[in-house]
Amino acid sequence: MSDQSRVMKVLAALLVSMTTGAFVLMALGNNPPSAGAFCLSSYYSLGPVKEAILSRACQSPDRWNRIEIYYSGTGAGNIEYLASLQGLTRPEDLNYHYVICNGFGGLDGEVQPTERWQKQTSSTPDRSWHGSTATIRICVIAPGINAHPTNCQVKRTEALVDGLCRVFGIQPQSIYYPGDWL
């Protein structure tokens, strides 16, 4: 007898909660939920960040001790576009290790390792950067002044940074983001 009473209580509670939920949804009107920050299907169609961390050259665990993320200053781009924009004859001459695309020139959030990363060579200090030979440079395609990176770029950059920190033992205080990073 107590089992039947318990079943009735559970069914009544279920009916009340479903009815309440239906009234709440009707009160909200015909406004569908806003689109998410990014489409998960496009996010998962990108290559794994783990693959981008691998390189053709041998990787020493103590080779890198710092990460710098900065904006390209452009609204679109990829490795080839940035090389031509900088007047370089070959994309291999870019002075950073990774490019994170924004959907204009490459898939949104696409992580493109440069030849510098593949060969495990250091960036060369220039007028815009004065890092050390143990700094990994990540270029995020974004103007950076009034336009910020896409949410997908932010998530993929953070995933890349986390992976690099794990592989090379880089400490959080050795990661430098742009001042207006989200």
Give the label of every model feature segment.
Residues 31-60, 66-173:
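Active-site-adjacent loop/helix surface patches within enzyme catalytic domains
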Residues 9-27:
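Hydrophobic membrane-insertion alpha-helices, especially the h-region
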Residues 1-7:
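N-terminal Lys/Arg-rich, disordered targeting/topogenic segments
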Residues 172-182:
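Catalytic cores and adjacent binding grooves of peptidoglycan-active enzymes
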